[in-house]
């Protein structure tokens, strides 16, 4: 039985063509009423932080200044109050930057998923060849196992190169989205505390103090009702659960990561209750847009529009499936 791999053939022993271009197998080595008090880190002017502190360096960095100018520019161009311009800026940035990257992430992961049957076939043939060679050369089980793992990693890497879908490429979204989230958060912190690197810094702080709506009318103060922080935690947990509901048979590492993200989602609630409402409003809008993008990228029509390859795990009714799984896990269970 032959298994084609990028122009190379895997043949049963004794041919061992698997290593035709490599050395032979060998064993491998091992206001008014008292305003809620902000924490020191949220209100201390940048100049008051230790001269060599990382916090000062980050708050005064060029990316944070750019984020400040983006927020000020959107606010000036639209004429919206701050409670409207912050969500608009968030949606625009997430739509222009993270949505394409999220689509690319799904594209890579779909190609990796479609490689799994071929990888399983290669693993079976390789395991047979290593077993025969180990018997011929008298390798120990440990040496045979290490040799199998080394060559399996090499062959999988060749598949990723062939199809241009190395899984690390799927992490580019995190490396862009997380810094952007941090820079925008620091920019809003600077604007809300008068520490903005702009001549209009203090006037912006005054605008933010009167630029809220409903129960969070002062965007420079924490939300005294905790409605924004709790809403943030709920949306973040909802994102986590939707992702988990779509997975079957998670590994132990994936399970640990899921518990960690759940814990961080809950921990963000008391943290969000101590920072200016402008920051929490940004966090809430960012999470809501993230949830919307997550659902959008499950749409068969949108996936086809983005040229994301079809996979065995795709569903024609993804939203109905999510609702059914959610109902089974959290509502209908006894």
Curated annotation (Swiss-Prot):
InterPro entries: YidC/ALB3/OXA1/COX18 (IPR001708), YidC/Oxa/ALB_C (IPR028055)
Membrane as UniProt keyword: yes
GO cellular component: mitochondrial inner membrane
Any GO molecular function: membrane insertase activity
Membrane side Mitochondrial matrix: residue ranges: 189-224, 285-334
Listed CDD domains: 5TM_Oxa1-like
Protein's recorded name: Cytochrome c oxidase assembly protein COX18, mitochondrial
Disulfide bonds: none
Compartment(s) of residence: Mitochondrion inner membrane
Transmembrane segments: 168-188, 225-245, 264-284
Annotated membrane topology: Multi-pass membrane protein
Topological domains, Mitochondrial intermembrane: 246-263
Source organism of the structure: Pongo abelii (Sumatran orangutan)
Designated gene of the protein: COX18
């Amino acid at each position: 039985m032959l298994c084609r791999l990028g122009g190379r053939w895997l043949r049963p022993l004794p041919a061992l063509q698997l290593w035709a271009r490599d050395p032979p197998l060998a064993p491998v080595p091992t206001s008014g009423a008292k305003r809620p008090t902000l924490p020191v880190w949220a209100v201390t002017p940048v100049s008051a932080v230790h001269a060599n502190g990382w916090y000062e360096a980050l708050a005064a960095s060029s990316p944070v200044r750019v984020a400040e100018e983006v927020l000020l520019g959107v606010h000036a161009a639209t004429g919206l109050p701050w409670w409207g311009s912050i969500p608009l800026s968030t949606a625009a940035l997430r739509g222009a930057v993270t949505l394409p990257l999220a689509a690319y992430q799904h594209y890579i992961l779909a190609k990796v998923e479609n490689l799994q049957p071929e990888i399983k076939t290669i693993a079976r043939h390789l395991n047979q060849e290593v077993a025969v060679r180990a018997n011929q050369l008298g390798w120990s089980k440990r040496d045979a196992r290490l040799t199998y793992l080394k060559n399996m990693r090499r062959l999988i890497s060749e598949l990723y190169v062939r199809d241009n879908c190395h899984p690390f490429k799927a992490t580019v979204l995190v490396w862009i989205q997380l810094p952007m989230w941090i820079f925008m958060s620091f920019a809003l912190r600077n604007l809300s505390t008068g520490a903005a690197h702009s001549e209009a810094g203090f006037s912006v702080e005054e605008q933010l103090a009167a630029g809220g709506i409903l129960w969070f009318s002062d965007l420079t103060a924490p939300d005294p009702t905790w409605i924004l922080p709790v809403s943030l935690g709920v949306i973040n947990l909802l994102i986590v659960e939707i992702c988990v509901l779509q997975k079957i048979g998670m590994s132990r590492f994936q399970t640990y990561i899921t518990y960690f993200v759940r814990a961080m989602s809950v921990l963000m609630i008391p943290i969000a209750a101590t920072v200016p409402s402008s920051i929490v409003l940004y966090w809430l809008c960012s999470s809501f847009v993230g949830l919307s993008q997550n659902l959008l990228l499950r749409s068969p029509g949108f996936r086809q529009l983005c040229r994301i390859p079809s996979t065995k795990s795709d569903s024609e009714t993804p939203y109905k499936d999510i609702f059914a799984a959610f109902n089974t896990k959290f509502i209908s269970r006894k």
